Amino acid sequence: MNKASGGDGIPVELFQILKDDSVKVLHSICQQIWKTQQWPQDWKRSVFIPIPKKGNAKECSNYCTITLISHASKVMFKILQARLQQYVNHELPDVQAGFRKGRGTRDQIANIHWIMEKAREFQKNIYFCFIDYAKAFDCVDHKKLWKILQEMGISDHLTCLLRNLYAGQETTVRTGHGTTDWFQIGKGVRQGCILSPCLFNFYAEYIVRNAGLEETQAGIKIAGRNINNLRYADDTTLMEESEEELKSLLMKVKVGSEKVGLKLNIQKRHLLLERKVMTNPDNIFKSRDITLPTKVRLVKAMVFPVVMYGCEIWTVKKAES
């Protein structure tokens, strides 16, 4: 299997071959970084490789990006991730399931499914609003991020390490036609870095707190507490028994988000409603040029994952089991 080298061109296999020697060198470098709070410039660099998606190839928005960073730097990032974890567990509420151990999208799907079942059982109306941000991870303001980390109680030493990592970071874009000059990035969390999901979760938590969602009495009463939102990183679901109250919650989140530079993605919400599993299946399944085994593989690859996603939360009657 082919594996990508790091942004510095050094493959991970080299560290595996060197074994103890590489461990000693990396340990020494990580100690030095922790003490001085300064990073090697190579560890601040990343290589972007754009991969085309569907649509017009001339539109930048129709590309996703693979990011290559130094494999050696990932050791230090793993150390910082472990340090940040204690703050994650302390500061983030249980309604946030994004990038947290033992939690996932299926948990939030199950929660919403359960709430809907209870609403039917007790004949209550529940209104949901599904929010998505436009380029959320790319729009994080660095100055605001450091301020938020301080307000979350993260140590000055750790915050300074992260600030210096972001200061002067550089990237280049590599395509089949060549590589661009290095240029600096002044906004957004680092792509390809394991610290980015954690940092964004703090950013998103600040928005919710600043919007006053935790203090308001709006929401649904569950086990004696008010629940008015469920989150998975930047994907947020607001819920309320009143349509007017839901609109009020949405406006609070909108205002709080705009204060830190994030905007709601109205277009994507519309597209999600209209999205189909396969745009034109007749051309495929009625074609005599495609063999039956190939058609079966297509169904397994394109239909089953969509239809069966979240099947763990399906309710099965006793007679059906």
What are these regions (language model features)?
Residues M1-Y203:
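Conserved pre-catalytic core of RNA-dependent polymerases
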Residues E274-S321:
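Non-catalytic, peripheral interaction segments enriched in hydrophobic/basic residues
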Residues K135-M152, L230-V260, R275, T315-K318:
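Catalytic palm subdomain of template-directed nucleic-acid polymerases
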Residues W34-T36, H113-E117, T216, A223-R225, ...:
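Eukaryotic intrinsically disordered and solvent-exposed regulatory patches
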Residues L80-Q96, L199-A233, T237:
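Active-site palm subdomain of RNA-directed nucleic acid polymerases
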Residues H177, L264-R275:
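Short, conserved micro-motifs composed of acidic
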Residues M116-A119, F130, A134-F137, A233-T236, ...:
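Residues that mediate protein self-association or partner binding, especially
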